[in-house]
Regions:
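N-terminal short leaders/motifs
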Residues: 4-20, 90-98
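A generic fold-level signal
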Residues: 16, 55-57, 66, 80, ...
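N-terminal strand-loop-strand
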Residues: 39-87, 114, 118
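A short glycine-rich, hydrophobically flanked beta-strand micro-motif that places a catalytic Asp/Glu
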Residues: 120-122
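Short N-terminal helix-initiation segments at or just after the protein's N-terminus
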Residues: 1-10, 31-37, 79-89, 103-108
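Acidic, metal-coordinating catalytic segment for phosphate/diphosphate chemistry
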Residues: 10-61
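Nudix hydrolase/Nudix homology domain
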Residues: 2-13, 155-204
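Unchanged
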Residues: 92-115, 124-180
Length: 204
């Protein structure tokens, strides 16, 4: 008999283990919690559902700050040459520690080995699709580069990686995201602005 939908939902919501999250908070600080709701387009919902089918409903996003204060950002093939860039992100594989996943994903997407420095935001997103609403979670960190050259390793997933200023990210890039009509970009614009607002509050 098929699994109980309520059981599946509970297991998906718990794809981030409480004890691992507690350890990250202890090591990198208590994040500010936010909720956001966005209407996703059909193709966006398809991508989220594909990830959900693999048992993952989260991402780890890292704002990698260089010594000059600029941030490493990526662009994917789906929106290549649009002017839209965002902080790199990715998810943990089954059984993979979240911190290890963050470091691996940052290397694959940017070519940099990074060190996490502060747990800034714990974002809870409601992905609104025509047939249902899907819960998503983003754990957002400040990070710093340790070694490497900015050059995507996973060139199938990443079209470009570069650096941008805070002003660009919260200004023209966030506006392009909001004007795109994509629910995912509306969420990323909100996440980006909240990240920098919280960074100011923390004075880091």
């Amino acid at each position: 008999m098929p699994p109980d939908p309520a059981f599946l939902m509970a297991s998906h919501l718990n794809d981030i283990k409480d004890n691992e999250l507690a350890a990250l908070k202890k090591k990198y600080g208590e994040p500010e919690v936010h909720a956001f709701t966005a209407d996703f387009r059909k193709f966006e919902c398809t991508l989220v559902k594909r990830t959900e089918a693999k048992g993952r409903l989260h991402d780890i996003t890292c704002f990698i700050r260089q010594d000059d204060g600029n941030f490493v950002v990526i662009q994917k093939p789906q929106y290549a040459r649009t002017g839209i860039y965002r902080a790199p992100s990715g998810g943990a594989n089954p059984g993979e520690p979240l911190e290890d996943a963050a470091i691996r994903e940052m290397y694959e997407e940017t070519g940099l080995t990074v060190r996490l420095t502060r747990f800034v935001l714990d974002m809870h997103l409601e992905v609104v699709c025509k047939d249902r609403t899907i819960p998503w979670r983003s754990l957002v960190f400040l990070a710093e580069p340790v070694v490497g050259e900015i050059k995507p390793v996973d060139t199938r997933e990443i079209f470009d990686a570069t650096v941008m200023s805070r002003g660009q990210l919260v200004g023209e890039v966030a506006q392009l995201m909001e004007d795109s009509g994509w629910g995912g970009f509306k969420y990323r614009a909100f996440l980006t602005r909240e990240f920098f607002r919280r960074l100011d509050e923390l004075n880091i």
